[in-house]
Amino acid sequence: DTLLDTDGEVVRNNGGPYYIIPAFRGNGGGLTLTRVGSETCPRTVVQASSEHSDGLPVVISALPRSLFISTSWRVTIQFVEATCIPKPSFWHIPQDSELEGAVKVGASDERFPLEFRIERVSEDTYKLMHCSSTSDSCRDLGISIDEEGNRRLVVRDENPLLVRFKKANQDSEK
């Protein structure tokens, strides 16, 4: 299965960029970054509180040299407009996170951390998954609201966040 964007076009491997937006409006916007706890830079992946925000654009990359992304492949995800964070700023789940299973950005221990997979749920709806580095098992990512009201992207065994991929056009209003 090939990953498609909201226009029905192929999501390009190491291309785009794309916004990751919720499949259903009403509970927040696209995925973005915020500062949590003692972070000096925004390093925590969250869902924007406003459903009118598409969040920050990402590039999705897979190791096979292909123009497209297959839903069976492990991928890296990185924000392209993340400020004050060392590049490359891959999504990853650090072992020492204050919230278990919370998705963060920053330099990873691995040069190209293939920690995530995107699985089709319906025709143009997908779910994000975090995959173990030691096995083939992957677990859903969903939203958990922390004590500060942040809608954090975390590993969840139920209620995965259902998403779509929207081209980040330079002339876009949002």
Curated annotation (Swiss-Prot):
<dbReference type="Pfam" id="PF00197">
    <property type="entry name" value="Kunitz_legume"/>
</dbReference>
<feature type="disulfide bond">
    <location>
        <begin position="131"/>
        <end position="138"/>
    </location>
</feature>
<dbReference type="InterPro" id="IPR002160">
    <property type="entry name" value="Prot_inh_Kunz-lg"/>
</dbReference>
<keyword id="KW-0646">Protease inhibitor</keyword>
<comment type="similarity">
    <text>Belongs to the protease inhibitor I3 (leguminous Kunitz-type inhibitor) family.</text>
</comment>
<dbReference type="InterPro" id="IPR011065">
    <property type="entry name" value="Kunitz_inhibitor_STI-like_sf"/>
</dbReference>
<keyword id="KW-0722">Serine protease inhibitor</keyword>
<dbReference type="GO" id="GO:0004867">
    <property type="term" value="F:serine-type endopeptidase inhibitor activity"/>
</dbReference>
<feature type="disulfide bond">
    <location>
        <begin position="41"/>
        <end position="84"/>
    </location>
</feature>
<dbReference type="GO" id="GO:0005576">
    <property type="term" value="C:extracellular region"/>
</dbReference>
<protein>
    <recommendedName>
        <fullName>Trypsin inhibitor BvTI</fullName>
    </recommendedName>
</protein>
<comment type="function">
    <text>Inhibits bovine trypsin and chymotrypsin, and human plasmin, plasma kallikrein and factor XIIa.</text>
</comment>
<feature type="site" description="Reactive bond for factor Xa">
    <location>
        <begin position="65"/>
        <end position="66"/>
    </location>
</feature>
<keyword id="KW-0964">Secreted</keyword>
<keyword id="KW-1015">Disulfide bond</keyword>
